[in-house]
Amino acid sequence: MANYFNTLNLREQLDQLGRCRFMDREEFVSEADYLKGKKVVIVGCGAQGLNQGLNMRDSGLDVSYALRQAAIDEQRQSFKNAKDNGFEVGSYETLIPQADLVVNLTPDKQHTNVVETVMPLMKEGAALGYSHGFNVVEEGMQIRKDLTVVMVAPKCPGTEVREEYKRGFGVPTLIAVHPENDPKGEGWDIAKAWAAATGGHRAGCLESSFVAEVKSDLMGEQTILCGMLQAGSIVCYEKMIAEGIDPGYAGKLLQYGWETITEALKFGGITHMMDRLSNPAKIKAFELSEELKDLMRPLYNKHMDDIISGHFSSTMMADWANDDKNLLGWRAETGETAFENYPETDVEISEQEYFDNGILMVAMVRAGVELAFEAMTASGIIDESAYYESLHELPLIANTIARKRLYEMNVVISDTAEYGNYLFANVATPLLREKFMPSVGTDVIGKGLGETSNQVDNATLIAVNETIRNHPVEYIGEELRGYMTDMKRIAVGG
């Protein structure tokens, strides 16, 4: 199979990359009605599979789960997830032929095998759904021409999809129809109904494309969302320990600090996050973030280039074929890092202390968000997509670190995201360790500036504020956050 994106001409590539429109709520007045009375069969019952299925059932859809016969016979976790929640469970051969919509929610590396297995069983004119387009875009899966192919991609982990639905809301969601597979012209009706059934329409849906979703998703998760948090955690912890800061305090400052800092980011963007600092600390964080942007821009651009060209995907798929040797090795190495093994502590850290003593963390967040956004938009991805795949998802990923450090982050994200995270962090960590960290001290990570006055030069502060507030990610962020009027607050501080 050929990489689908690479079969397109330049005009088609740019058109697909630039697809992203925030949809009016009026476009969802019929909610999930288009799929009511039809049979939805989900393949896979992990976090996304189970939680999307629960939401769809609660929205009035007929949902069942098709699993491999071995998973049923051995009563694996996927079988238990579905059965314990009262769903019908059957083999592919039993359930797939009845399905009007087959939703493939298995891990990326299983997609080719799953689709090749279920496609011959699907009835003529049925629909096939994805929540990530890697199989279509990067692997170039050829799907029967009578089948409609759609995507509904919630912009958060599966557990959050369920929790937001239960509180009467939802999570922002990208939806798309594969242009090669919409024979009856009903793709958008199916995608909108599926998105509404998960609750996504209440938080806002973006009309996107398979290409835009995949390329922006890969870039965000490799760099700012996962790779930067991993590299930052490792080098900041090392620095604090080397400077004599208590290991328990250093670890807790990082583990819960990312979550606390990005909580401010979620509600008011980079501007509000930086405003949580004192004037001297804000100027210092700004200066550090500018240095970081200069240092790390080539690395961010390389990841974007490798994603656009397909080099990243081919490299990762080669590791799939080698039994995930690199992935598993990098996972083990991460588990051995000092940050992952810092001693538990009962030390109290106030919310503001995370900002005051984590100035470098704030700088890393600003630099990482802006670099990822800039790399994406320079490659033809439009601002809305770039925002959701950088700034918007960052608090959700930071929350996983707060739960169980880097281990939890790498468990919750997909194998594709985990592989890309390691590729980035394995270069970013020594880069920061050698070229940046020697020049910083505990005044910006661990102890704070200890200033007795908030006084700064007015002209300098005005210039810093203008630069922060006039970045394009702040403009689109303010617009998109306006659509999300009921965002859930998360606990901060551990």
UniProtKB/Swiss-Prot annotation:
GO BP terms: isoleucine biosynthetic process; L-valine biosynthetic process
Residues where Mg(2+) 2 binds: 217, 389, 393
GO MF annotation, one: magnesium ion binding
Domain KARI C-terminal knotted: from-to ranges: 209-344, 345-487
Keyword Oxidoreductase among UniProt keywords: yes
CC cofactor note: Binds 2 magnesium ions per subunit.
Binding site for Mg(2+) 1: 217, 221
Functional note: Involved in the biosynthesis of branched-chain amino acids (BCAA). Catalyzes an alkyl-migration followed by a ketol-acid reduction of (S)-2-acetolactate (S2AL) to yield (R)-2,3-dihydroxy-isovalerate. In the isomerase reaction, S2AL is rearranged via a Mg-dependent methyl migration to produce 3-hydroxy-3-methyl-2-ketobutyrate (HMKB). In the reductase reaction, this 2-ketoacid undergoes a metal-dependent reduction by NADPH to yield (R)-2,3-dihydroxy-isovalerate.
Protein name: Ketol-acid reductoisomerase (NADP(+))
Species per Swiss-Prot/TrEMBL record: Vibrio parahaemolyticus serotype O3:K6 (strain RIMD 2210633)
Lineage of the organism: Bacteria, Pseudomonadati, Pseudomonadota, Gammaproteobacteria, Vibrionales
Primary gene name: ilvC
